Amino acid sequence: MPHADIRTSTITPLVRATPWLIALYFIAHVALDAVSYVQPVLKLGITPLSPQTGLVLAFLYAYRGNFWWVAAAFLVSEVVIRGIPMHSWILPLQAISITAVYQFAAWLLRKKVPMEGVATLSGTLKFIAVASVTAIIAGTVSVGLYTLSNLIPADQFSSALARFWVGDLNGILLLAPLLIRFADTPLLLRAILSRPAAFIGVLLGLFAAFTLVFLVGNPGDLRFFYLFFVPAISAALIWGVPGFLIAALALQISLVAGVQRLAEVAPLVDLQFLMSTLLVTGLALGAVV
């Protein structure tokens, strides 16, 4: 296996986060929420991209005793980024409920699908399943609260839930594995640098795809975005799951930048459903090659 040297087999024991780490988590949570606040629904925070969910799951997975810190981060982020809604009672209830969902997901992953160690297809599929269910439950709670308080019309429940779900799902699939295995970053960098030609090829592939989609082709046509699959999947075949996620992270940043800078581009929510397909495919491929 060409990327076996970037996989570890040690499951990290739970420890308490230091005050500095908690402060860093707060800053990162709010920052990720802010940069991904793109194309929201009625300024209620329902965006098609929520990278902070991956941070939340990784933090709860790696450190114990942080439920209330995470709930507070959700609450602070909502107030800072979106302001206080008409019914202010929603905010603490939403923050506590969503944190409980992610706390259970983190516990379930540690018990049944430990994220450290050699990536397997079975473990990867279980992780994807946990991420999908976590996102749909969190989405149902949030959108349900907004609907019950008449902040969202009942006939928009399903569309708002779909937007919430895909945003949370992609955040989990993309960032949680990278952050949980952050200690493996030096090994990954050495593996990448040991194959400079492959690294340059993937980098040029991402640049070429971005150029063809946003500058040459029609960014309003979703079919053009399949060009991004080629370099991302190539990274999965070369470096496994960690390499694929690095490429996917670069791709996600490119998509957000393109959507924000161009007027005529496919809706970000449609691009995120496409991104979900890529993430599931790349994670599965990276686990078996």
Where are these regions (language model features)?
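Short helix-perturbing small/polar motifs within transmembrane alpha-helices
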Residues: 2-48, 52-152, 176-189, 193-222, ...
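Short aromatic-rich membrane-water interface segments that cap or initiate transmembrane helices
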Residues: 157-170
